[in-house]
UniProtKB/Swiss-Prot annotation:
The modification Omega-N-methylarginine is found at R245, R250, R253, R322. The modification Dimethylated arginine is found at R245, R322. It comes from Homo sapiens (Human). Binds single-stranded RNA. Has a high affinity for G-rich and U-rich regions of hnRNA. Also binds to APOB mRNA transcripts around the RNA editing site. Residues 1-66, 235-268, 311-332 are annotated as: Disordered. The modification Phosphoserine is found at S81, S242. This is Heterogeneous nuclear ribonucleoprotein A/B. Residues 69-154, 153-233 form the RRM domain. It comes from the Eukaryota. It is found in: Nucleus; Cytoplasm.
């Protein structure tokens, strides 16, 4: 078990004005949020409450439930194993389950995991300790708390011809799915023209589910792509959870380069990317798995298999960083 002295990166994406980010339906539902941290070192016994199942089963089964004995542990070395993690925390109390989240593509640790104590008092003991070190790294344990998400009623529609369809045509098409509360048609302030995307808010959540049954829709001859829209703050957190997966094979939209986008023209990509930098955006890919978790100090929102600490930048308009650990891990 080798030491990993380098920090594993976290980075926030830029979004400022009136912003909503468009994300896939998978992110909706319940989440989790993390609270303050603590320290230690130890040796362990097998998890007594998990003898009939694989490690992590109890944690996974209760992912949408409050559990006073559950902790999130961030900042782990890629070399730290589940046994190492369990051995360390056993000195604070009986550990009934333990898991480290792995990237299914690389088989490598994503640098964070979960501990489930039999007794909630063990969590307080962990938090009472000021610093925790494991495998040469300062780690950051936090309480795991369930957090219910608001119903999603707003969608992003990208790939539209800015000249058409008209607002009336957009309302006519999407009104078939349910009652529309509002339609936003963002403008290019320099050209004083519409951009190639809109936001639609329905009065209920059900129409959003219906619209998302198809990824692409054709409105007045324009093939458009549909995503769930949500506030930029949530989107920024979500970026680190489902990770670089959203951009992994995409170009730098903000600079008008590359990127798929379902056949949209480069000029649309360019305009869309510029507007994203003002507070709008959307992410294509999504790790399934643990969508809906929100460890907000770390931004592990919706941590799906695509997350990797080495996937530094995840927003369109910035180049990706790949490779090993980097010294800009910023949990707060």
């Amino acid at each position: 078990m080798s030491e990993a002295g380098e920090e594993q990166p976290m980075e926030t994406t830029g979004a400022t004005e009136n912003g909503h980010e468009a994300v896939p339906e998978a992110s909706r539902g319940r989440g989790w949020t993390g609270a303050a941290a603590g320290a230690g070192g130890a040796t362990a016994a097998p998890p007594s409450g998990n003898q009939n199942g694989a490690e992590g089963d109890q944690i996974n089964a209760s992912k949408n439930e409050e559990d006073a004995g559950k902790m999130f542990v961030g900042g782990l070395s890629w070399d730290t194993s589940k046994k190492d993690l369990k051995d360390y925390f056993t000195k604070f109390g009986e550990v009934v389950d333990c898991t480290i989240k792995m990237d299914p593509n690389t088989g490598r640790s994503r640098g964070f995991g979960f501990i489930l104590f039999k007794d909630a008092a063990s969590v307080e003991k962990v938090l009472d300790q000021k610093e925790h070190r494991l495998d040469g790294r300062v780690i950051d344990p936090k309480k795991a708390m369930a957090m219910k998400k608001d119903p999603v009623k707003k969608i992003f529609v990208g790939g539209l011809n800015p000249e058409s369809p008209t607002e009336e045509k957009i309302r006519e098409y999407f009104g078939e799915f349910g009652e529309i509360e509002a339609i936003e048609l963002p403008m290019d302030p320099k050209l004083n023209k519409r951009r190639g995307f809109v936001f639609i808010t329905f009065k209920e959540e059900e129409p959003v589910k219906k619209v998302l049954e198809k990824k692409f829709h054709t409105v007045s001859g324009s093939k458009c792509e549909i995503k769930v829209a949500q506030p930029k703050e949530v989107y920024q957190q979500q970026q680190y959870g489902s990770g670089g997966r959203g951009n992994r094979n995409r170009g730098n939209r903000g600079s008008g380069g590359g990127g798929g986008g379902g056949g949209q023209s480069q000029s649309w990509n360019q305009g869309y990317g510029n507007y994203w930098n003002q507070g709008y955006g959307y992410q294509q890919g999504y790790g399934p798995g643990y969508g809906g978790y929100d460890y907000s100090p770390y931004g592990y929102y919706g941590y799906g298999p695509g997350y990797d600490y080495s996937q530094g930048s995840t927003n369109y308009g910035k180049s990706q960083r790949r490779g090993g650990h980097q010294n800009n891990y910023k949990p707060y």
